Amino acid sequence: MADAYCLTNFIDFSLSLSLPLKHHNRIKYTCFDISDSYIIFGASSGSLYLFNRNGKFLLLIPNKHGAITSLSISANSKYVAFATQRSLICVYAVNLSAQATPQVIFTHLDQSVQVTCIHWTQDEKQFYYGDSRGQVSLVLLSSFIGHSLLFNMTVHPLLYLDSPIVQIDDFEYLLLVSNCTKCILCNTEYEDYKQIGNRPRDGAFGACFFVSPQESLQPSRIYCARPGSRVWEVDFEGEVIQTHQFKTALATAPARIQRPGSGTDELDANAELLDYQPQNLQFAKVQRLNDDFLLAFTELGLYIFDIRRSAVVLWSNQFERIADCRSSGSEIFVFTQSGALYSVQLQTLQSHAVSLIQQSKLLPCANLLRQHVRYFADKAREDYELKQLNPLKQLLIERQEYELLNDISVIFDAITQCTGSALDTHSSGGSSATTERSLSGGSSSRAPPKGVYVLENAFCDNLKQPLKTGHFKDALLTVTGKFGKNIIKYKFNIFAEEQQQLVRELIPASERSLPFKDIKARYESGSEDQEEEIVRRCKKPAPQVPHISPEEKTLYNLYLIAKSAKFSRTQCVDRYRAVFDEYAAGELVNLLEKLAQVMVEHGDTPDQAQRNCYEMYFDYLDPEMIWEVDDATRDHIAAGFVLLNTSQNAEIVKCEHCSFPLRFDTSCQYHELGAVLLRYFWSRGEQLKCFDVVQSVPALLDVLAKFYLAEQNLTKVVAIVLNYGLPELLADVGKQLSVSAWGRCFEQFVELQRGGRLVCANCECISGVEQEQLGRHFFYNWNCFLNIALDHMSAGDTLALIFKWSSYIPNDAIDREFYSRCLLKG
């Protein structure tokens, strides 16, 4: 089974950090970094504060060049690069000698530029930095031969991007740069640059290399954060392999830091009852943690992912206003906006439990086991090391922690199964006796003394040897007659009410010979003074209920949601969003096809069922996901879009030569989805697919007009604008039309008014249109057309075109208000 993890070894460095600043209340720490030897802080005063990894203050490095905004320490801890608010990039050579004068060299940058990130290479003499202008530069350091004393630094610009740099990482000759719109992979050896993925984004998202220690078993990868709690997995050629979606997986309870005496067991018990929503997050920085995990953070939480399994390891909201994080091995350092620093360690639950035992913290260990009973029970059957937990049982009996012992007894039974040896079973209370039983088949058991009740251990029936004469099964507890049945009843009430469900999940029903309720009933009905015998009872098999698979339940629930939405005429996307989030794109398409069959079985026509399923899908679908789904899913979306926008009653006037739409209804369902679909096809050079969609859904011609406008194909732009017949489209396109283009538009508008002739946007041939078709919309009159033209041209140019075509303009076609606007515009 997969390991479960927790955050342990919490350290608060607040006291250590406050000592150097105790006489300087106005100075604040602004940024930090760590190495194997040091923790270093930049401050608002411009100085550097150097500590060892235990938090002991070592050295103050003064600096008079302004507050420090970013810093990074080299891998060998010899140099610290930092940037200041006054647009300086500086390097400090670490020297802890009391007699040495701190050596800092610097170079000036453009005053309008701020450094946003710094990254050292494995070579101690060079580092990269990115700035707010989008520029990435390489800094080379020079030092005296054989000494760490610096005497020069040179800056070499490498990349000029379109937005501020967010994160930089490198591996050998590869450089990875993430800015606010995209990720760039650079081969510095061949000066080759490639954008990762095709879809731009907006915001700070990080990216990093994840180099595998065993390349043959698991290849190295690049991981890029994406909007909506997604992560791209990318190979070293810059090709996106897959997208990991963690939005739904993060709808779990946050992990609490394991601290003795913190009461996390009670808090975690309450946390399980809460309903956690999916998290839509933006990760501005991602980094490697240990050899297996990816660490990310937001202002409100830490997030650890196992990308290889596409799983969330844990997330924690125990820190407030996180400013930055660093990882070192399994240790995580968290720096907050208030200037505080904390560290925690990522450990498996198993390792943490063993470490608590080794530190003689037995009661905290028992509470940890109770929080994660199922995990430890499964682990105990696999791992012999957990036999170290056995001392817990004696401690709990001595302290009379019977409830806690009952809660975790399944773990001790599993340890017995793993070790193959019998556990001593202790009596409850201070005067409890011990009944020893042999597991060997040849030995016999003594009958218990009068007043001692031996209760069958329902957890371990499958571990027992076959019964022989005089044998008793393993007992969970042996209880002297002094305590009677009340304490036994109390214990099994706990089992019946709190752990019955857990036992059913862990032990198959066929292996539980005596249910809890039968045990409980016998002790309630028996006499306190009489010796009782527990008899194996055979339960009559319950009548079989028709089995319904989880998928069938899901389909039925979706059908009920769709039916209620149909009658209430409301959107119910929030009710089925959580269901859809659990499926990959291809799986979701298959699910909807099965849902359509269910709708047909309940009386819908095949066409209506298909439309209903498409509407549910499109209400849920983010149009931007079209860029990331596979081709089959994308074609499915295109087919559904055409189906929903195809009406038998729609009146479309088509070209006489090529049957391309000329006049049509401009209403469109899911227009944004269709626009993204066209943009995808057009960007891939698949213009034929664009025209197939547009011919079926001509309301998307406004999107096509903008494509042609970008290519300066004004003939098609003007044709589409006049055919589309919406003032909003002409007003939008008119911003980019020149005076000559407006002249061409005037010419075609005159032809339209004179004879009802439209130019086909496909074949560019002229076709006649009935005047009734033209008079249905306000756009096709001179007042509307000229007022839009006046918005984008000078009054003189507009009047010149009117004068040119005045013989074709009716006398009463233009209102006085238009001429008044011309006079006001000058």
UniProtKB/Swiss-Prot annotation:
<keyword id="KW-0716">Sensory transduction</keyword>
<dbReference type="GO" id="GO:0006726">
    <property type="term" value="P:eye pigment biosynthetic process"/>
</dbReference>
<dbReference type="GO" id="GO:0031409">
    <property type="term" value="F:pigment binding"/>
</dbReference>
<dbReference type="GO" id="GO:0007601">
    <property type="term" value="P:visual perception"/>
</dbReference>
<dbReference type="Pfam" id="PF23756">
    <property type="entry name" value="Beta-prop_HPS5"/>
</dbReference>
<feature type="repeat" description="WD 2">
    <location>
        <begin position="63"/>
        <end position="102"/>
    </location>
</feature>
<feature type="repeat" description="WD 1">
    <location>
        <begin position="22"/>
        <end position="61"/>
    </location>
</feature>
<keyword id="KW-0608">Pigment</keyword>
<comment type="function">
    <text>Has a role in the biogenesis of eye pigment granules. Eye pigment granules are specialized forms of late endosomes or lysosomes. Biogenesis of pigment granules in the eye requires molecular components required for protein delivery to lysosomes.</text>
</comment>
<dbReference type="Pfam" id="PF23757">
    <property type="entry name" value="TPR_HPS5_insect"/>
</dbReference>
<dbReference type="GO" id="GO:0005737">
    <property type="term" value="C:cytoplasm"/>
</dbReference>
<dbReference type="GO" id="GO:0048066">
    <property type="term" value="P:developmental pigmentation"/>
</dbReference>
<dbReference type="GO" id="GO:0006727">
    <property type="term" value="P:ommochrome biosynthetic process"/>
</dbReference>
<dbReference type="InterPro" id="IPR056499">
    <property type="entry name" value="Beta-prop_HPS5-like"/>
</dbReference>
<dbReference type="GO" id="GO:0048072">
    <property type="term" value="P:compound eye pigmentation"/>
</dbReference>
<feature type="region of interest" description="Disordered">
    <location>
        <begin position="422"/>
        <end position="447"/>
    </location>
</feature>
<keyword id="KW-0844">Vision</keyword>
<dbReference type="GO" id="GO:0031084">
    <property type="term" value="C:BLOC-2 complex"/>
</dbReference>
<protein>
    <recommendedName>
        <fullName>BLOC-2 complex member HPS5 homolog</fullName>
    </recommendedName>
</protein>
<dbReference type="GO" id="GO:0006622">
    <property type="term" value="P:protein targeting to lysosome"/>
</dbReference>
<keyword id="KW-0853">WD repeat</keyword>
<dbReference type="InterPro" id="IPR056446">
    <property type="entry name" value="TPR_HPS5_insects"/>
</dbReference>
<feature type="repeat" description="WD 3">
    <location>
        <begin position="110"/>
        <end position="149"/>
    </location>
</feature>
<dbReference type="InterPro" id="IPR015943">
    <property type="entry name" value="WD40/YVTN_repeat-like_dom_sf"/>
</dbReference>
<dbReference type="InterPro" id="IPR035431">
    <property type="entry name" value="HPS5"/>
</dbReference>
<comment type="similarity">
    <text>Belongs to the HPS5 family.</text>
</comment>
<keyword id="KW-0677">Repeat</keyword>
<feature type="compositionally biased region" description="Polar residues">
    <location>
        <begin position="422"/>
        <end position="446"/>
    </location>
</feature>
